[in-house]
């Protein structure tokens, strides 16, 4: 299922705009967030055809999602009481409405003294972290949850491609907390 919004720019136009934003912000590397949103010409749930399609590109320096200490020593995680949505609203797009669950999950984790939350699907299997895909590497095998309840985005696809290039076996399967041990 697609969200059915026609972006009025080509991939080439968007790529050039992202490069220009990085240059304007004096960034050699950083985080780029292109967003697509509908205008305000009309109100209501059925007014999509009457609304303009807008695109904005933000970029900023962001050295790492976790601090360097976390990379060296690991982080503490908790099992979130918040359940992950079915394949984020049946779309392989990042949709802002699906972040509500993740925000509640990570805030709950922090209130419990952990750095991150792991969300489960409706069947009790691991879906993903509050802001990241989850991968386990054991015995030259990369394991990751199926895409039924996680975002199958660029990052996930890139990690899988890199793992295959490194000759790791890649297994997409239902994962439990016991698999993390």
Residue ranges and their predicted role:
Residues 37-42:
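Short, internal active-site loops enriched in acidic
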Residues 27-35:
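Ordered, amphipathic secondary-structure segments that act as subunit-interaction surfaces
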Residues 1-24, 43-181:
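Helix-start/capping segments and mature chain N-termini
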């Amino acid at each position: 299922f697609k969200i059915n919004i026609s972006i009025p720019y080509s991939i080439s136009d968007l790529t050039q705009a992202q490069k220009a934003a990085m240059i304007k912000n004096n960034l050699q590397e950083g985080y780029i967030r292109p967003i697509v949103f509908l205008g305000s010409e009309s109100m209501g749930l059925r007014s999509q055809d009457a609304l303009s399609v807008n695109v904005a590109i933000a970029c900023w320096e962001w050295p790492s999602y976790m601090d360097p200490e976390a990379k060296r020593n690991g982080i503490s995680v908790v099992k979130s009481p918040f359940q992950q949505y079915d394949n984020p609203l049946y779309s392989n797009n990042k949709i802002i409405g699906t972040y509500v669950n993740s925000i509640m999950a990570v805030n709950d984790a922090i209130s419990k003294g952990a750095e991150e939350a792991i969300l489960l699907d409706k069947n009790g299997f691991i879906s993903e972290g509050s802001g990241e895909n989850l991968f386990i590497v054991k015995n030259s095998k990369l394991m990751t949850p199926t895409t039924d309840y996680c975002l199958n985005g660029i990052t996930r696809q890139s990690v899988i491609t890199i793992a295959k290039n490194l000759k790791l076996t890649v297994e997409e399967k239902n994962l439990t907390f016991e698999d993390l041990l």
